[in-house]
């Protein structure tokens, strides 16, 4: 509390005085930072390679990389999603893998997220420790990207996600198309 007193006088010799007490209240603290949803990337267009990062996905991930470069203390979380049909395939493959050690188990949601992270790290130069991968429970062939500012907690802001053990899922290596044999080119040109 602060006491304030005012005294005034005019040119005719009149005076006046007033006093008051003012309570100064501290302003409320700023709201805690929250996780921001950035974009949703669809992987439904390529039926043969449903976890591949295509050019459309790269455009979205380029924006994510720019956001991370603008906010050096922020992190990103990439949440891969899969369809019910893909989850059924994974469950079936896991049963086979329990009996056969060399059996392959496709984890579509984790693979999508890991491929998106790999693009951010290898192509855009984002530090791998700033990008986390998780899987979600939404039905779809998508990846949801989130920006987590310093002081925010992803797990409390976004429910229904599970962190991915990146040692159990491998990044899908991009393979260039095989070069066509010259005889095939001539046959195609002759038609």
Report each predicted region and the residues it spans.
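Trihelical helix-turn-helix/Myb-like DNA-binding core that engages the DNA major groove
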Residues: 117-120, 127, 131
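Short, conserved glycine- and acidic-residue-centered signature motifs
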Residues: 54-57, 105-109, 113
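Periplasmic peptidoglycan-binding/tethering modules of Gram-negative envelope proteins
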Residues: 1-76, 89-98, 126-129, 136-191
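Short helix-coil junctions and helix-kink-helix linkers
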Residues: 95-107
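A beta-strand-dominated structural motif
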Residues: 109, 133-135
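Cysteine-centered nucleophilic/redox motifs
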Residues: 78, 109-121
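Short acidic, S/G/P-rich loop/turn micro-motifs used as interaction or catalytic elements
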Residues: 83-88
């Amino acid at each position: 509390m602060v006491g304030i007193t005012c005294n005034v006088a005019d040119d005719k010799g009149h005076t006046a005085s007033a006093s008051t007490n003012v309570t100064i209240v501290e302003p409320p603290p700023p709201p805690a930072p929250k996780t921001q949803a950035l974009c949703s990337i669809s992987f439904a267009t390529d039926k043969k390679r449903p976890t591949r990062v295509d050019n459309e996905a790269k455009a979205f991930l380029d924006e994510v990389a720019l956001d991370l470069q603008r906010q050096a203390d922020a992190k990103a979380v990439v949440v891969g999603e899969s369809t019910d049909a893909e989850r059924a395939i994974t469950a079936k493959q896991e049963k086979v893998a329990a009996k056969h050690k060399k059996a392959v188990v496709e984890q579509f949601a984790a693979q999508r997220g890991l491929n998106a992270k790999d693009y951010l790290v290898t192509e855009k130069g984002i530090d791998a420790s700033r990008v986390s991968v998780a899987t979600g429970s939404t039905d779809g062939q998508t990846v949801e990207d989130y920006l987590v500012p310093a002081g925010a907690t992803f797990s409390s802001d976004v429910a229904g996600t599970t962190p991915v053990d990146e040692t159990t899922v491998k990044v899908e290596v991009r393979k260039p198309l095989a070069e066509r044999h010259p005889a095939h080119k001539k046959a195609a040109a002759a038609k």
